[in-house]
Amino acid sequence: MSVKNTQYYIDLENQYGAHNYHPLPVVLDKGEGVFVWDVEGKRYYDFLSAYSAVNQGHSHPKIVKALTEQAQKLSLTSRAFYNSNLGEYEKKITSIFGFDKVLPMNSGAEAVETAVKIARKWSYEVKGIHENTAKIIVCENNFHGRTTTIVSFSNDPDANNNYGPFTPGFLKVPYNDIDALEKLLENPSDIAAFLVEPIQGEAGVFVPDEGFLIKAYELCKKNNVLFIADEVQTGIARTGKMLACDHEGVHPDILILGKALSGGMYPVSAVLTNDEIMNVMKPGQHGSTFGGNPLACAIAIAALDVVEEEKLSENAQKMGEIFRSKINEIISETNLITAVRGKGLLNAILINDTPDSSTAWDLCIALKENGLLAKPTHGNIIRLAPPLVITEEQLHECISIIRKTILEFNK
């Protein structure tokens, strides 16, 4: 009889699962707050937070309570009927973020697809673009999901190699290049929207220059082009504000949320906008069997309550400043790390090596051995994003682990 240890579970996945991920060799079995435990019982600090889906911490009791109570009452109705949770959730989320309407979905990619459809429909029915000619501007090195349409406007070879033919109708500009965006908008007659991540997460936590977002927003307004913010990873307090756009006072025409909208407890995403834009959608024109289900709504309400009640935006802002300051001290002691960048508790360190090297991966393995889990986003970048419930004492312990690992690795 085989022992059910780490290797057993890794072998099981390798044998029966598609090989479309390259996980760190750790098998997680339990999570609570900022901690996760592997099947052997070793405890780790989680510095990925499921790509910012568990901002509220693992197994938050309030969110668990909402899930278990609602699951025993009513989980799914489809949208063929009204349910007693959806309206309450819609009222709450539109109130928090300042929009008229929300369209509920499940995954982040679904929400991006939904936003694209809404923007195109608005462009034909309100702006008056000739049918089937609307364009959406996107940024190079973007990550908005993995559906066929979304990878159509990715320039990551892993995302789109051998998946064609691709969906047309997208124009690319370099990220953080306001001049390139302005040039594309010189003739805005067939442009429906500009879709942007306020901080590019998968690209390596690339923070644009201050003023880029507000200038881009103003250009869109001037040219009657919708400004769509994909805050699936940056939203829900991760960057020290409820939205990363809030740092520049930008209120998007269309807002995309996901991940931490449920505290990592259930797939919940949302597209928010105003009446003029959302009202182009009519019954039967878009939907989802699971979107807006009673269970999802109960969980999302609880998850949003936790963010507000525990002041997670404020904690992310404070802890993020401490983190970057301390990492900069480590940088002065080593030539392995060249920079730290980020906002709030969405951060990354840049490794002094090439993007195709294994150094970032090897360093993550060493961090794992020392009790902290993180993942490279490229060969020379490591994203560091703990749950937003982390305390200052815990953060300092994590910084000590990172420092020890880097200095030992550098020998």
What are these language model-derived features?
Residues 2-411:
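Conserved N-terminal phosphate-binding loop of PLP-dependent enzymes in the Aspartate aminotransferase
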